[in-house]
Amino acid sequence: MAGEQNIKYFNIKGRMEAIRWLLAVAGVEFEEKFFETKEQLQKLKETVLLFQQVPMVEIDGMKLVQTRAILHYIAEKYNLLGKDMKEHAQIIMYSEGTMDLMELIMIYPFLKGEEKKQRLVEIANKAKGRYFPAFENVLKTHGQNFLVGNQLSMADVQLFEAILMVEEKVPDALSGFPLLQAFKTRISNIPTVKTFLAPGSKRKPVPDAKYVEDIIKIFYF
């Protein structure tokens, strides 16, 4: 088991969830420190946040900010970034695609009325019309159990997370994508993934009205 890491964020999914996933799948213990007030966040902004933004992860004597930088460091450290430069580039490419999809969903709870309805349609259309067909084809062409090479990578973890996020909004999103369905089953059976999916883990629940209220209070009141 790797050394414990310290992460600072809100007690929500947000941009930290991809980091939680990667640490958990790598089998890394991590401690969470949550912001519950605007004052707590402001204090950190004034002291250690390089760009006055979270998430932040304390790891190997560093205070890392910026989600992608954190993800790449964790992936490199725990052998989830491929065996050579070509695999590295492919993994980053696939990960960036899934991050684009996940960012569509992250903002969804904060929308209202017609804008929220339109965003749900956009999520469904882009998942089923752009991203899932692309990854279905990657799996078909590659012919392996994973997206790159034949071992688990950051790209697999993020695609799995993206699938779960989409299915929370569009339950039938994987219909018509048999290879992605099989991929989801394979990844869900990895022991560390099973553990993170189980009740009582540090995985955060689907955002609800309280989630939105808490974040608005911290940022705007």
From Swiss-Prot:
Residues 3-82 form the GST N-terminal domain. The modification N-acetylalanine is found at residue 2. InterPro entries: Glutathione-S-Trfase_C-like (IPR010987), Glutathione-S-Trfase_C_sf (IPR036282), Glutathione_S-Trfase (IPR040079), Glutathione_S-Trfase_N (IPR004045), GST_alpha (IPR003080), GST_C (IPR004046), GST_superfamily (IPR050213), Thioredoxin-like_sf (IPR036249). Signal peptide: none annotated. PROSITE patterns: GST_CTER, GST_NTER. GO terms for cellular component: cytoplasm. GO terms for molecular function: glutathione transferase activity. Glutathione binds at residues 9, 45, 53-54, 66-67. Its EC number is 2.5.1.18. Residues 84-208 form the GST C-terminal domain. It is found in: Cytoplasm. It comes from the Eukaryota. Keywords: Acetylation, Cytoplasm, Transferase. Its main location: cytoplasm. The keyword Transferase applies. GO terms for biological process: glutathione metabolic process; xenobiotic metabolic process. It catalyses: RX + glutathione = an S-substituted glutathione + a halide anion + H(+); prostaglandin A2 + glutathione = prostaglandin A2-S-(R)-glutathione; prostaglandin J2 + glutathione = prostaglandin J2-S-(R)-glutathione; (13S)-hydroperoxy-(9Z,11E)-octadecadienoate + 2 glutathione = (13S)-hydroxy-(9Z,11E)-octadecadienoate + glutathione disulfide + H2O. The modification N-acetylmethionine is found at residue 1. Belongs to the GST superfamily. Alpha family. Glutathione S-transferase that catalyzes the nucleophilic attack of the sulfur atom of glutathione on the electrophilic groups of a wide range of exogenous and endogenous compounds. Involved in the formation of glutathione conjugates of both prostaglandin A2 (PGA2) and prostaglandin J2 (PGJ2). It also catalyzes the isomerization of D5-androstene-3,17-dione (AD) into D4-androstene-3,17-dione and may therefore play an important role in hormone biosynthesis. Homodimer or heterodimer of GSTA1 and GSTA2. This is Glutathione S-transferase.
